[in-house]
């Protein structure tokens, strides 16, 4: 049990545990239980917008008799609810609001239930008419989310206080006549428990740890200790709004697009037993609170939380195994929930994330202070987009929003990576690991907004682009109008707990009664009263403040956001050589509020800058400089090498990773990603003029201008027509052993290509290409040492790509003018066959003395397309066209210098099936069976998943009959 504290003091507990709540098992009708589940989800959203994930609070409660009436005339959709409590009148003005429910959402049960196995609820009837939202005492800062079916349930917020209302249980309930027309209700009025709660300092813990860095989104952490890893570089304020980290390439970047998080809510048996018939309503109320939080403009994105399915587990053996081990429970739930999800995103019941609510006290690795747990950055991973929430009352709404934040790749606000963005206000936002008080004007921190924007901009939220077909409508009533302060205390501290009135903490902190050593004490978990909780005559709590209900119109009407003007262009990422600069605009003209839509469209624009050539830096490329910058930080030794010298690695790097700073340890062969992104403006690869922008490769011309169409001609002239150079070529054969010169290529040569084709069907014929520098040193295959794999050779600012000596077509190519002369050689070893080596390159023509202006045509090429295969032997194609000086089609181009339109690629062998030896026969006589292992292996012998191998080539006979001898 949670220790109690004396009256007047405040109990603070870390965010992951809200205390041991008395488990009251109650058996009620299943439909009502499911309604409470829906209401809980609705309240989750409202409270998340007002507070934090699992904060201790102070509460008091009162028995009230709600007065409900419909507005006459044209405003017939408006419902007014009056509550007299805590020495004040609370007037709730409510409008129907079931927008968080999918129109055709499915409610399912697992195991024993009083009703049918699955219910498909019509959103226009059944549940949808139950839910309302609105304001309290007209206060524009207030909010309410209520259900008016089977009594009043829900929460509302007024002037820093949260109010929770629900029907009074047992003998405390007396039914009277309601103030509604008889045709609308045949029931009599019912006493309700109204709880009022204020928030204090302190908080509970989330199960996500911040002591390590976060991996890329496609990593798969298996334990809590690796769940919250982060990229190497810290985000900086000027990076706000820009994507960071690796990810799939998106066609539209820096664009604000509407996202829809289709959600399945799951309640285990402990939830069904505790909440009984009110379960579904309770869950939807929580979720509606969370949904409103994700509509706040401080998140800087258009994110809509919707419920498409609710599943209640009535027999725990048929659900996921739920234990006090939060990490294990999360793993079990993630594995279990996948079986209930349709693989097709077009299925109306397909969900993007699943949330398990349980009354089980969750524990972390050291303490039981865990209120929730989720993996980080997994929203579109069907196997890991899930979270576990410990239900400790309506404050579980905060936990829900917080854990969903982790699923959206948000770290805790006090993580070191957020320090430069959040400043000193890291404990006043939803993603605070220990929330003391919520900044209602900005519930999401700058770091949270930056991280979710980066996450979505880098293509990790593509599954959220489809608008749900049949979302479940969420209740619009404020939670405080559904669950009073007393009921809120019962949710948190047990059925015997009541609200402790405290005028100083009205709306800010909910205090509740308890006993310690036989004495009556007040205790709190420092959560505010639920929005909609009455805080005086005509007033209610909204966002921790007690406000007039008459001000409802100021915050009940949604205001849609609109883009403001573009800001000034920022600093250029490079001082020369072609950098990138940005301009941004904000959704602040006006800022969306009251659930209004966030702006859609491009939020960031970028352009090229400082495109002039850089001064010669010993012939080093810009990527070389970035790799070498890590030399002084790399003191670890590899083998006998005293230190590490880093050089760029291009060969073997996946196209999607070209804009990571992948560097190779010189002379060793190890390579690492030293930075998740190169500096903006860095060329993507030596054979392309495209440049990197925020970790993604974008097209640029040879003039270093983004979106320019200019290309280098064969002479290496940007935008040239190929008329300023001439082709030099030759074919050489040799039979003598040792090293022999083929050709010395002078400085200034462009488009160098040397080909050495081995005999058909042979990987090598005893002859290999080599390169010697002008000073006599070898930069390739010298001293009878061969490089068998594809690699890039960086020499004096020139990058040469070598195919590797084991390739069927041994080849050397260049992509920029040669800075110094190089000699191409052939190495003959053993009884080598006579090699045939062909070379071509282009040299600048000498200046002519006459003034004739000839008509020129040239071959114009486009960039290489994708390889036809990822392994084995594939091909790449590109468009090669003959055009005149004006860019029009022509036919005068010399065919002998026509660039190739195809080239081989993907030389690495494909994964293949490998069978093991047969096992002994299962019988020593007569007909038995034998079997052998089957596995998928890579070209280097590593074991892969079976999906990596060709299923059409899978051996069929890895089990067979056998007969050693006939039985006598």
Curated annotation (Swiss-Prot):
Residues 1-23, 177-253 are annotated as: Disordered. Disulfide bonds join 334-386, 363-368, 380-463, 418-447, 489-512, 500-522, 507-541, 535-546, 572-609, 576-614, 587-599. Ca(2+) 2 binds at residues 262, 345, 466. InterPro entries: ADAM_Cys-rich, ADAMTS/ADAMTS-like, ADAMTS_ADAMTS-like, ADAMTS_CR_2, ADAMTS_CR_3, ADAMTS_spacer1, MetalloPept_cat_dom_sf, Pept_M12B_ADAM-TS1. Glycans are attached at residues 548, 721, 765, 783, 946. Residues 49-253 form a propeptide. Residues 560-615, 855-911, 912-968 form the TSP type-1 domain. A motif (Cysteine switch) lies at residues 204-211. Its main location: secreted. Residues 214-229 have a biased composition (Polar residues). GO terms for molecular function: heparin binding; metalloendopeptidase activity; zinc ion binding. Its EC number is 3.4.24.-. It holds the Pfam family ADAMTS_CR_3. Residues 477-559 form the Disintegrin domain. Binds 1 zinc ion per subunit. The spacer domain and the TSP type-1 domains are important for a tight interaction with the extracellular matrix. The conserved cysteine present in the cysteine-switch motif binds the catalytic zinc ion, thus inhibiting the enzyme. The dissociation of the cysteine from the zinc ion upon the activation-peptide release activates the enzyme. Metalloprotease which cleaves aggrecan, a cartilage proteoglycan, at the '1691-Glu-|-Leu-1692' site (within the chondroitin sulfate attachment domain), and may be involved in its turnover. Also cleaves COMP. Has angiogenic inhibitor activity. May play a critical role in follicular rupture. This is A disintegrin and metalloproteinase with thrombospondin motifs 1. It comes from Mus musculus. The gene is Adamts1.
